Amino acid sequence: MRTSRECGRFAPTRRTIAVVVVAILVITLAVIAALLLPRPFEPAHAEEVQGGLDHPWDIGFSDDGRMLVTERIGRVRVYASGEPGAGLLHTATIPDVRTELESGLMGIAVHGDAVFICASRDTGNDWNVELLRSTLAADGSLSPFEAVPIGEMTGAARHQGCALEVDASEHLWLSVGDANLPRGENAAQDSDRLNGKVLRVELDGSIPADNPFGNAVYSLGHRNPQGLAFAPGGAVWEVEHGTDENDEINLLEPGGNYGYPCFTGADAAGPIPDVCGRASDYLAPAWASGSPTLATSGAAFLIGSGWGDWEGDLIVSTLKEEDLRRFTLNAGELTLEQTLFDRRFGRLRATVMGPDASLYLSTANGSDDRILRVTR
């Protein structure tokens, strides 16, 4: 029979038991403290407005406050308002939308009872980007969408752009990506082609008399412009994805050439001697990310006294970095001031001012996506 001394080699001593108990208590208290500690201070508040969406791309509001949301799979959802849990009034499904990688139903703009959308469509003959128009009825229903003819825009699985806005002069602005066409094809530098451009047309698709090239093109040399925003004074700002460097924010000028594929940021994107001119031929961005890129997407200027000293600042959403970036604007110069909601909600795409002076965002995580409302 083993003695108690022999068994003691395997039996825990009182000191061992005490150490274990203390360690468990320390770990438990640390976990409880972590759970009770508040989140790092956020200077803005976000709440969910709608959930359960499938790749929501953009958000628009009617004059009476109804909220319209595009889903990339080809749906437009009409809600009674931008309030949390507002009722769904209507869902419209757009035929022939081609959903592949980045393509599908994208931008939306609402002006009066007119609803404009930008979609990548394949009717079996051609794959194109199209501008479509519908009428919003009092009950929230939408008439069948019809194409607004503005010219051929090549569709593709990547680089569609498709930001839409209507300005105070009732011009419709549409950004169109370069469709990932070969750089040697130089679509973004060809003012006779609509890919790789920001377009400006009348609401019926006709060409404004003061457009710089006599067609729909307002500016050129863009890669994948997914954000358009009007500053309080009316200036138009554009946000686009770079390659592996230099996402850009540009102040648009009529006829302005923003460089792609020849120059991005302040640097050459690579020698293409047959299509590239001098660096001085191109307009430098107001801001560029350098390397790495952030995947900048939607953009909006903050309007309303509720934003305090942020009023007039530019907010840009990012997909890859999963946050918002706040920029101040002084004498035409942008300064990155702050990062908001860092990786709190995942990928962020749409950034839209609502009629209540709140900021509305869409997530782009691929499952159970949401619309968020941000206030300060």
Per-region residue spans from a language model:
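Beta-strand-rich domains and repeat architectures in extracellular enzymes and scaffolds
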Residues: 48-74, 294-302
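Surface loop/turn motifs at the tips and blade-to-blade linkers of beta-strand repeat domains
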Residues: 48-54, 92-100, 148-156, 216-221, ...
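Beta-propeller domain segments
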Residues: 103-105, 178-338, 346, 356-360, ...
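Residue-level detector of Asp-centered blade-edge/turn motifs that repeat once per structural unit
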Residues: 61-64, 110-113, 166-170, 230-233, ...
